[in-house]
Amino acid sequence: MGRGSVTSLAPGFRFHPTDEELVRYYLKRKVCNKPFKFDAISVTDIYKSEPWDLPDKSKLKSRDLEWYFFSMLDKKYSNGSKTNRATEKGYWKTTGKDREIRNGSRVVGMKKTLVYHKGRAPRGERTNWVMHEYRLSDEDLKKAGVPQEAYVLCRIFQKSGTGPKNGEQYGAPYLEEEWEEDGMTYVPAQDAFSEGLALNDDVYVDIDDIDEKPENLVVYDAVPILPNYCHGESSNNVESGNYSDSGNYIQPGNNVVDSGGYFEQPIETFEEDRKPIIREGSIQPCSLFPEEQIGCGVQDENVVNLESSNNNVFVADTCYSDIPIDHNYLPDEPFMDPNNNLPLNDGLYLETNDLSCAQQDDFNFEDYLSFFDDEGLTFDDSLLMGPEDFLPNQEALDQKPAPKELEKEVAGGKEAVEEKESGEGSSSKQDTDFKDFDSAPKYPFLKKTSHMLGAIPTPSSFASQFQTKDAMRLHAAQSSGSVHVTAGMMRISNMTLAADSGMGWSYDKNGNLNVVLSFGVVQQDDAMTASGSKTGITATRAMLVFMCLWVLLLSVSFKIVTMVSAR
């Protein structure tokens, strides 16, 4: 197995592509006659060789138990569609159905599984050799007229036993003896590539060389920048330069090569036996296979190809810029500062201190604290209750009443009450009485009392307008009485009595004397009188009937006793 061959891979490196990679990259490039970056698949006629002879024909010399080959299909008939899969000692038999290989939602190829049988059909002996045959199925190539069935890609492996072996690993086990005295090993053409690379090609830049400016470069103070250039986040305010249009120029200190409006690029062409250069900081087009469309005349709708000239010069107005302009700032020089980047103090950036509430200009905090002053919470019942002299035309009781006048007033009040209880219960009569009290100047006490009783508001009759059955029943029960009492209160203030009178208990703590007057009016209810008279008549009649029944019963009993005693 040729350990010293140039195609040997180091331990751990294996050629194990996926189905999509086999179809979309390797088989498609082979059909389109395009070169490979690393040619690992050989071309052979699978159906002219036995499976155990194929490992020696592989380009990859390893002990792995799977091999890859390009093969041409052999038609059984020149004008037919059947394929001749017979070898000298056996044949490959199809097993199962063909499976689709998809790239997203698009079908890009088909996969067929075949098993090798010794002998001739239909009595062949089944073996453990299995082949996966991949064929291309691309609508774009079909429209372009590219023959897709010119080649098929075959993956051949040998199972460890009969039956399905899903998930079986076909990698060779590691043998330490094979690599004990192994020296430096290169992949194909890697040594030639390393010899052709000079030390002064500036492909690799040491970090110590950043402070040194190359002498062969022409440095400009200000170079125009393309409109679609992305400045990134490395810029500050426009205070670092005095340029008229700092957004379209690079600040001094950025080394740019004068190449006629283009950026000079290192040579990175990929020949058939060349290995790509991986350079940190460059931006490459995002594509799984960037070169798969070159050579077939087919443009994929999902892939954008970059066009380059023969002298390896790339136009700078592309979003795939290979020169990291924002990485070549020198330590002691100012950063690029375009004016289209937002400064930090433009008000659009929210700081933590901005979340606090700003104090208004016309707001005085001292007035707010003095609004709820405890001195203004002093309770004054006179302000809440209003003045005590709430009766109209009320005279002040500052004079000390004489005992004789007080006796006359009390006597006059008794006479008025007796006159009121004499049976005069109508409201018109009561109003006349109050008018009489007002017209009598010799009874000031009763005059004040009448004013007070007249100031008492009458109850509202709103509830009587919406009487329900329960309310009417309660009202009837309440109005069944014949006596209604009306009460009023009169307050006498600023009145002094003799110390030995013994009447100090009648004053409250404020020195006021409260007098409660009650007036009772007897009303005659005609309905109750009528019902009472009917009840008396009924009782009298029942009593008479009862007495007549007793008289009749006694007379009959007496008659019977007389007759019995006579016999």
Curated annotation (Swiss-Prot):
Domain NAC: 9-159
Transmembrane residue ranges: 544-564
Compartment(s): Membrane; Nucleus
InterPro entries: NAC-dom, NAC_dom_sf
Gene null: resulting phenotype: No visible phenotype under normal growth conditions.
Keywords assigned by UniProt, alphabetized: Activator, DNA-binding, Membrane, Nucleus, Stress response, Transcription, Transcription regulation, Transmembrane, Transmembrane helix
Entry keyword Membrane: yes
GO cellular component entries: cytoplasm; membrane; nucleus
GO biological process: positive regulation of DNA-templated transcription; regulation of flavonoid biosynthetic process; response to high light intensity
DNA-binding region: 108-165
GO molecular function term, any single one: DNA binding
Tissues where this protein is expressed: Expressed in root meristem. Expressed in roots, rosette leaves, cauline leaves, shoot apex, stems and flowers.
Domain notes: The NAC domain includes a DNA binding domain and a dimerization domain.
Role according to the record: Transcriptional activator activated by proteolytic cleavage through regulated intramembrane proteolysis (RIP). Transcripition activator associated with the induction of genes related to flavonoid biosynthesis and required for the accumulation of anthocyanins in response to high light stress. Plays a role in the regulation of 20S and 26S proteasomes in response to high light stress.
Protein name from the UniProt record: NAC domain-containing protein 78
Encoding gene (name): NAC078
